[in-house]
Amino acid sequence: MPCCRRTVFVEDLPLIGCIAFGLIDRGTNVIQVRPSSMCPLSCIFCSTDAGPKSRHRLTEYVVDLDLLIEWFEYIVKFKGEKKIEAHIDTVGDPLAYPRLVELVQRLSEVKGVEVISLQTHGVLLTEKIVDELAEAGLSRINLSIDALDPLLAKKLAGTERYDLHHVMRIAEYIASKPNIDLLIAPVWVPGINDHEIPKIIEYALKIGAGKKWPALGIQKYEAHKRGRKPRGVKLMSWGQFYRKLAELEKKYKTKLILRPEDFGIHKRPMIPILYQKGEKVLVEIVEKGWLKGELLAVDKKRQRVITVVETQVPIGTKMYVKIIANKHNLYIAKPL
């Protein structure tokens, strides 16, 4: 059965260290901004098991806006305060964040921020919200449309409430706006929506997506340990995926194999990784974790949040843990 979850308002935790909320720096000029983990959909291919039908999630997070901006400014300053892209891409849908327009406005006011982009399935978007986001400074909406067949679209979204016609109307509205760009970003799920991908390409080109950036960003479905795995799907290799994209590029004469430079993405210093794999760290347990079997902890100086697995101790417990993962400052640890 779908899990029951609690919602935590994050107002005094470090915003570096957890994949579910806060900020992620992967060593480029793009900073991932994750103000909320919630999502109204339960897509059958979701890599983060989001939405009402989640089986693995224990907690949802909503981050205080002032705290988010404070930590964002810290990372921007570290990177040199120039040519920064703030990419709002949650483990759910950013439109679930109640202060999204204000977030975009505040991000746009940070010195060095030149692009603000957002990833969404669009079900919570309206023409009014699009206007407000554009006025606040949003540069581009990456809109996931995974099928143009209404029944298949509902199946992929994991809910009968998914309204494809609404999302298409919003897509066309965004494309008509001169001050905001649209990128259509379907997930290609082999054996399920193969025949939809050419239709989506034709649709994106027809409505005028990609005024400044590429019109399409086709995503390869990947099976993740705690993500959803549609029955009967056989994964494409990356080689197969790129060969298919190359064929479609040739047919439609549009760019489908994307590179970082297509978006102005380049390497930039990454904020320091404070703890190495195998290192012993004293932490305090401060919250339930994002997924079942996890707890959230902070280090002694409250500089990083650390996900602790394989233990269930009371909140407030101080304990030593061993870091087992630290890539891009996303920390996972086990108790000693």
Where are these regions (language model features)?
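N-terminal [4Fe-4S]-dependent radical SAM core
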Residues: 1-35, 48-59, 74-82
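Short cysteine clusters
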Residues: 39-46
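Alpha-helical scaffolding segments of alpha/beta enzyme cores, especially the outer helices
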Residues: 67-70, 74, 99-109, 128-132, ...
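Short, electropositive alpha-helical surface patch
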Residues: 101-107, 193-214, 272-283
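Conserved C-terminal portion of the radical SAM core fold
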Residues: 165-228, 240-260
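Terminal RNA-binding accessory module
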Residues: 264-336
